[in-house]
Amino acid sequence: MKENNLNRVIGWSGLLLTSLLSTSALADNIGTSAEELGLSDYRHFVIYPRLDKALKAQKNNDEATAIREFEYIHQQVPDNIPLTLYLAEAYRHFGHDDRARLLLEDQLKRHPGDARLERSLAAIPVEVKSVTTVEELLAQQKACDAAPTLRCRSEVGQNALRLAQLPVARAQLNDATFAASPEGKTLRTDLLQRAIYLKQWSQADTLYNEARQQNTLSAAERRQWFDVLLAGQLDDRILALQSQGIFTDPQSYITYATALAYRGEKARLQHYLIENKPLFTTDAQEKSWLYLLSKYSANPVQALANYTVQFADNRQYVVGATLPVLLKEGQYDAAQKLLATLPANEMLEERYAVSVATRNKAEALRLARLLYQQEPANLTRLDQLTWQLMQNEQSREAADLLLQRYPFQGDARVSQTLMARLASLLESHPYLATPAKVAILSKPLPLAEQRQWQSQLPGIADNCPAIVRLLGDMSPSYDAAAWNRLAKCYRDTLPGVALYAWLQAEQRQPSAWQHRAVAYQAYQVEDYATALAAWQKISLHDMSNEDLLAAANTAQAAGNGAARDRWLQQAEKRGLGSNALYWWLHAQRYIPGQPELALNDLTRSINIAPSANAYVARATIYRQRHNVPAAVSDLRAALELEPNNSNTQAALGYALWDSGDIAQSREMLEPAHKGLPDDPALIRQLAYVNQRLDDMPATQHYARLVIDDIDNQALITPLTPEQNQQRFNFRRLHEEVGRRWTFSFDSSIGLRSGAMSTANNNVGGAAPGKSYRSYGQLEAEYRIGRNMLLEGDLLSVYSRVFADTGENGVMMPVKNPMSGTGLRWKPLRDQIFFIAVEQQLPLNGQNGASDTMLRASASFFNGGKYSDEWHPNGSGWFAQNLYLDAAQYIRQDIQAWTADYRVSWHQKVANGQTIEPYAHVQDNGYRDKGTQGAQLGGVGVRWNIWTGETHYDAWPHKVSLGVEYQHTFKAINQRNGERNNAFLTIGVHW
């Protein structure tokens, strides 16, 4: 029995008296048919119209009509109960409860006991006089005594309870008639609960006792009566009633004794326990009594020894309660005698405790075996048995038993004890850790502490797959040793995870060894800041020569020159001047400010022991000093030492690019990209390299990678204007290298008859040096390829059809149609300069003659931010262009030339659309036996539309529609009135 059984709470429930007054109508739901009203058909025929009229008037709150009609009907059939109820309901509906009450009381005289009338009468509220003082209560009682009724007795009693005048309420029950009525019984119940609430325990006891004498006390009330006596601490009354045979059930004895214990009435309780020997009906009741004896008797051991146990199951309790005292006092003989009173197969646990206390190892082992056989799943029994086996020098059997029972599922504390014991036994008997047993022992257990224990077992501690299975969840509860084991296993396969494990171990057990492990691992994963911080935690005394150079190397990688130099000074003091790494680090002190000194140190390092790092560092200086051949040589030497070093391959690829060896550059950059797949600069360079080599599929492949990389960055943070421009440039590159065919249409249509103008300011446009009212040209070009005649050139073939208005001044360019087919060559990679040879043939057979034209054209100042290409950033951009064009007609020996300079502003109006106001000046020349020339200027505006873009291709098509006003400043044979002209311009690039 537990101590908290003394805290039994005794509760009482109070009875709340409420009056439920009906708010429904006085009349039942009677109906209006003859049968429901109890009328003959004739009488119903006569009365129904007036009844219907009355009901409608009542519904419409027409009091006069409703009451008049209902009263008339009642006069006609005064004994009819349903119609009387309708009239009473009407009275109540219009607030005449007194008239309704008189009507119903009169009708009850005619029909005594009618339930319908009584219900309706009872539903009428009765005004209850408010009683708020004792004087008013006594006056009410006096009035009721003069003319007693059940109602007034009940009201006086309830008012007395409310005013806590229990004697007055009790006096009402002296009226036998009232006491026997339902109202009287209610008052008695309320009085009892009120007495309990006010803790007038004697009053409550009297009422319960009266009920017992009247044989009206229920079992629940009897239990409540006992609780009242306990709550009021009416001990003498309880003893008196028990002496009369009341409250003599076993539970009452236990409850009263428990209450005495709770109140601290020790002397009274001891006397009560001695004087009373209840007859219990269950072993649990007897065990509770035994607990009280063992806890509160003057001599608990003697009390229990003298007690005659009624239930056999409680004998062990008696022994269990007395045995610890005997053992504590060292009375082992007495304890054994006490146990001898029980059968040999009982109280094995206690017998085991005695054998352990008396150091009887053989008996303890025998009992441990018996206990284990009874409860083989009980870890405590396994603990006892294996311990006793070890005490009896039977460790092999203990180990076998533990291995059989592994894993130890159950109590965590006992499980940990068994695990520690098994680990100790396996250390002593390693041959027991067979592969099969190790496989079982390495299966992860549910608790982190258990898995940590598993990881240190023989056969597992050095087994990385098993360690990863056990500790791979990285529980924060693992100790430093566990994290170290995990770090060693991840060191080669997952170096970043290994660093995390080393850091966890360092947090739990800071030491020079742990700091060193973190430093080396952090350097391996290129977390130089963490590596440097770890090295700085180690004193110079604890650092080896190798550690000093490694620390200086880490400081160099972390960009901390001061820390590097401090460690280098210590290395110099230790005489490490003949170490190649020392001179490589020493060289870093002079980079980039003193390259000559750095070169000397790097050369010294290479002479001591060639290393890839030294060669790469020296190559970097050579490249900065534009000694590209020396840089290439050193980088090739570095690759011989580290053939698979992706960074060195990339550096050599860049150097070969600088030297102009584009093909060799690609051979280095491609394997470098495999090793550094996420290096964006390397991917960009590969796109440029393959463009130079005219490898369209490869160029587009790397351009797509660049675009995807920029798009991925946009998912994280918004793109900068520079990134946005780069994305567009590579989309343009992707589109440009894939282009083979280009179709273009250019036309200018003069709006004024007789006026001449020119719109020749595009490569391959109208013939240079000539002016027309209108001009039109349609051209198709096919790119043959790059690097055809020179490295970086572009060769194309084209064919065009063009016409003008001739000299007759028609508006549309339909005169002098010619066709031209030629070869166009762009010799320079980075300049817009074309040389073309074209065979021209007339198409109408009348005007013009076939001829061969040699043509050179160029465009300047129209690149980058000043180009007419779409700009992805900003709301608009400034553009300019200087166009030069010259032609030689071989057969006719005619020369023509044009120079045009244009400035314009592109204002974005939508995505892929601009409005472009522009101005330009132009000089034209034409020599055919004589020289002709013209200087003109023009202003205009164009609507440019780019279209056809895809995710990877920038706008491949452009349409321009414009209008231009042009003025000729100087011309030969042109009248002043013809020097001004306006014309429409159309340009399509597809």
UniProtKB/Swiss-Prot annotation:
GO terms for cellular component: cell outer membrane. This is Bacteriophage adsorption protein A. InterPro entries: NfrA_C, TPR-like_helical_dom_sf, TPR_rpt, Ycf3. Residues 1-27 form the signal peptide. SMART domains: TPR. SUPFAM superfamilies: TPR-like (SSF48452). Keywords: Cell outer membrane, Membrane, Repeat, Signal, TPR repeat. (Microbial infection) Allows N4 phage attachment by binding to the viral non-contractile sheath protein. TPR repeats lie at residues 81-114, 612-645, 646-679. The keyword Transferase does not apply. (Microbial infection) Interacts with N4 phage non-contractile sheath protein; this interaction is essential for viral adsorption to the host. The keyword Nuclease does not apply. It holds the Pfam family NfrA_C. One of its GO terms (biological process) is secretion by cell. It is found in: Cell outer membrane.
